[in-house]
A protein has these predicted regions:
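Active-site nucleophile-adjacent alpha helix/oxyanion-hole segment immediately C-terminal to the catalytic cysteine
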Residues: 1-54
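Conserved active-site-adjacent core of cysteine acyl-enzyme catalytic domains
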Residues: 3-9, 45-159
Length: 159
Protein backbone atom coordinates (compact mmCIF):
# COMPACT_ATOMS: atom_id res chain seq x y z
CA UNK A 1 0.00 0.00 0.00
CA UNK A 2 1.31 3.44 -0.90
CA UNK A 3 0.29 6.99 -0.07
CA UNK A 4 -1.86 8.86 -2.57
CA UNK A 5 -3.95 12.05 -2.62
CA UNK A 6 -6.17 10.93 0.28
CA UNK A 7 -4.13 8.16 1.95
CA UNK A 8 -1.00 8.79 3.99
CA UNK A 9 0.63 5.55 5.12
CA UNK A 10 4.03 4.36 6.28
CA UNK A 11 5.16 1.81 3.70
CA UNK A 12 6.55 -1.56 4.76
CA UNK A 13 5.65 -1.15 8.44
CA UNK A 14 6.05 -4.66 9.86
CA UNK A 15 3.64 -5.81 12.55
CA UNK A 16 4.01 -8.34 15.33
CA UNK A 17 1.60 -9.90 17.79
CA UNK A 18 2.22 -9.54 21.52
CA UNK A 19 3.34 -12.70 23.32
CA UNK A 20 1.40 -12.17 26.57
CA UNK A 21 -1.92 -10.62 27.57
CA UNK A 22 -0.18 -7.56 29.05
CA UNK A 23 2.68 -6.72 26.66
CA UNK A 24 0.91 -4.69 23.97
CA UNK A 25 3.06 -1.68 24.98
CA UNK A 26 6.39 -3.45 24.58
CA UNK A 27 5.17 -5.08 21.34
CA UNK A 28 4.12 -1.68 19.95
CA UNK A 29 7.49 -0.23 20.96
CA UNK A 30 9.31 -3.09 19.24
CA UNK A 31 7.33 -2.50 16.03
CA UNK A 32 8.47 1.15 16.00
CA UNK A 33 12.08 0.23 16.79
CA UNK A 34 12.01 -2.33 13.96
CA UNK A 35 10.60 0.29 11.58
CA UNK A 36 13.60 2.54 12.21
CA UNK A 37 16.37 0.04 12.94
CA UNK A 38 15.35 -3.01 10.91
CA UNK A 39 15.27 -5.19 14.04
CA UNK A 40 14.33 -5.05 17.70
CA UNK A 41 16.92 -4.03 20.25
CA UNK A 42 15.43 -6.09 23.08
CA UNK A 43 13.11 -9.08 23.44
CA UNK A 44 9.50 -8.18 24.28
CA UNK A 45 9.69 -9.37 27.92
CA UNK A 46 12.96 -7.48 28.42
CA UNK A 47 11.25 -4.34 27.11
CA UNK A 48 8.34 -5.03 29.48
CA UNK A 49 10.76 -5.18 32.40
CA UNK A 50 12.41 -1.89 31.42
CA UNK A 51 8.96 -0.28 31.04
CA UNK A 52 7.81 -1.58 34.41
CA UNK A 53 4.89 -3.41 32.78
CA UNK A 54 2.79 -5.61 35.04
CA UNK A 55 0.42 -8.51 34.49
CA UNK A 56 -2.44 -6.53 36.04
CA UNK A 57 -1.89 -3.00 34.71
CA UNK A 58 0.20 -3.48 31.57
CA UNK A 59 2.33 -0.49 30.57
CA UNK A 60 1.71 3.15 31.40
CA UNK A 61 2.83 6.18 29.41
CA UNK A 62 5.71 6.89 31.77
CA UNK A 63 7.06 3.37 31.20
CA UNK A 64 6.80 3.81 27.43
CA UNK A 65 8.66 7.14 27.60
CA UNK A 66 11.33 5.67 29.91
CA UNK A 67 12.10 2.88 27.45
CA UNK A 68 12.59 5.17 24.46
CA UNK A 69 14.66 7.63 26.50
CA UNK A 70 16.79 4.70 27.74
CA UNK A 71 17.63 3.75 24.15
CA UNK A 72 18.53 7.37 23.40
CA UNK A 73 15.52 8.55 21.43
CA UNK A 74 13.91 11.97 21.62
CA UNK A 75 10.39 11.41 22.94
CA UNK A 76 7.23 13.47 22.59
CA UNK A 77 4.39 12.36 24.83
CA UNK A 78 1.22 13.50 26.54
CA UNK A 79 3.22 13.65 29.79
CA UNK A 80 5.19 16.71 28.74
CA UNK A 81 3.86 17.89 25.38
CA UNK A 82 0.65 19.62 24.37
CA UNK A 83 -1.91 17.27 22.86
CA UNK A 84 -4.37 18.26 20.11
CA UNK A 85 -7.40 20.08 21.53
CA UNK A 86 -9.79 19.35 18.68
CA UNK A 87 -10.51 16.57 16.22
CA UNK A 88 -9.33 18.79 13.37
CA UNK A 89 -6.02 19.47 15.18
CA UNK A 90 -5.66 15.74 15.90
CA UNK A 91 -5.99 14.92 12.20
CA UNK A 92 -3.40 17.58 11.31
CA UNK A 93 -1.05 16.12 13.97
CA UNK A 94 -1.49 12.59 12.61
CA UNK A 95 -1.06 13.55 8.97
CA UNK A 96 1.97 15.75 9.69
CA UNK A 97 3.76 12.99 11.62
CA UNK A 98 2.99 10.35 9.01
CA UNK A 99 4.19 12.60 6.18
CA UNK A 100 7.45 12.90 8.14
CA UNK A 101 7.61 9.07 8.31
CA UNK A 102 6.95 9.11 12.05
CA UNK A 103 4.70 6.38 13.45
CA UNK A 104 2.57 7.43 16.43
CA UNK A 105 2.32 5.10 19.43
CA UNK A 106 -1.05 5.57 21.11
CA UNK A 107 -2.85 4.14 24.10
CA UNK A 108 -6.61 3.96 24.24
CA UNK A 109 -9.39 2.35 26.26
CA UNK A 110 -9.81 -0.87 24.25
CA UNK A 111 -9.25 -3.95 26.43
CA UNK A 112 -9.10 -1.73 29.54
CA UNK A 113 -6.07 0.04 28.02
CA UNK A 114 -4.29 -0.95 24.83
CA UNK A 115 -1.24 0.28 22.90
CA UNK A 116 -1.24 0.45 19.10
CA UNK A 117 0.70 2.38 16.46
CA UNK A 118 -0.92 4.78 14.01
CA UNK A 119 0.73 4.06 10.66
CA UNK A 120 -1.85 5.50 8.28
CA UNK A 121 -4.60 8.05 7.78
CA UNK A 122 -7.21 8.02 5.02
CA UNK A 123 -9.54 10.96 4.36
CA UNK A 124 -11.53 8.62 2.08
CA UNK A 125 -11.33 11.32 -0.59
CA UNK A 126 -14.27 13.25 0.84
CA UNK A 127 -14.53 16.87 1.97
CA UNK A 128 -16.00 16.01 5.37
CA UNK A 129 -13.90 14.42 8.11
CA UNK A 130 -16.57 12.24 9.69
CA UNK A 131 -15.64 9.24 7.53
CA UNK A 132 -11.85 9.50 7.96
CA UNK A 133 -10.05 6.40 9.22
CA UNK A 134 -6.80 5.56 10.97
CA UNK A 135 -4.76 2.52 10.00
CA UNK A 136 -3.21 0.93 13.06
CA UNK A 137 -0.48 -1.61 13.62
CA UNK A 138 -2.17 -3.61 16.38
CA UNK A 139 -0.20 -6.10 18.50
CA UNK A 140 -3.48 -7.75 19.57
CA UNK A 141 -5.31 -7.93 16.26
CA UNK A 142 -8.40 -9.93 17.08
CA UNK A 143 -10.97 -7.60 15.52
CA UNK A 144 -11.10 -9.44 12.21
CA UNK A 145 -10.36 -12.90 10.91
CA UNK A 146 -7.12 -11.88 9.23
CA UNK A 147 -4.94 -11.38 12.32
CA UNK A 148 -2.40 -9.63 10.12
CA UNK A 149 -1.58 -7.01 12.75
CA UNK A 150 -3.49 -4.23 11.01
CA UNK A 151 -6.76 -2.65 12.02
CA UNK A 152 -8.79 0.22 10.61
CA UNK A 153 -10.70 2.44 13.02
CA UNK A 154 -12.89 5.50 12.54
CA UNK A 155 -10.67 8.49 13.33
CA UNK A 156 -13.47 10.46 14.97
CA UNK A 157 -14.36 7.57 17.27
CA UNK A 158 -10.71 7.08 18.22
CA UNK A 159 -10.24 10.78 19.04
Amino acid sequence: MQSDEHLTILPKFATTQQITHYTCGPAAANMVVTYYKGKTLDEELAVAKIMGSSKTAGTNTKGMVNYFEKIGWEVHSSIKDKTPDSYKDFLKFVESNLKNNTPIIVENVDWGGHWRVIIGYDSMGTAHQSDDVLIMADPYDTTDHLQDGYSIVPAERFF
